[in-house]
Amino acid sequence: MEFSNVERVSLPKMLVASYEVTSAEPEQTATGFVENWLKNKGLNVGENGVRGFGFDCHKGRDIPEGCRTYHVYYSVPDNINGDPEIQIKDFAGGNFAKLTIHDPFSGDFPSGWGVLLKWAFDNHVDNLLGCTSPDDCYSFFSNEDTPCLEELYWNKGEQYMALYLPIR
């Protein structure tokens, strides 16, 4: 597992298919469900601009013990309609600090969030989470208003994960 240097990026406003799952391991369930839904619409992640993002989303919610809520956004073209389980909504985009991780599942990829937070505080970059030190930020990670996004993708047969921390 390797971390890149942190960089400032802007994610564009985009139309997204939105879905969330609450369970002990919600990431695989949420991503699998939406990726299958996309395939049924003739769309595949990584093709024709379709990108997938996920984030924890449990702040202020009553979640059963041992569970987490994970929310996913997948960018979609304007002509896609949702259904009872998938909402189509606007993602506002914005400014983010981005850390890319090569081969993220070969190590402790969540430690990348600490790298991003340390970079933001060391460089006096305002994060949009509302935390005042790296140590108190983790409780702010999980809301839809200022999501800390994870994006998995492949490049030349290698897997990567980009972590996005919302900043001013």
Predicted regions and their residues:
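A solvent-exposed interaction/effector surface
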Residues: M1-R168
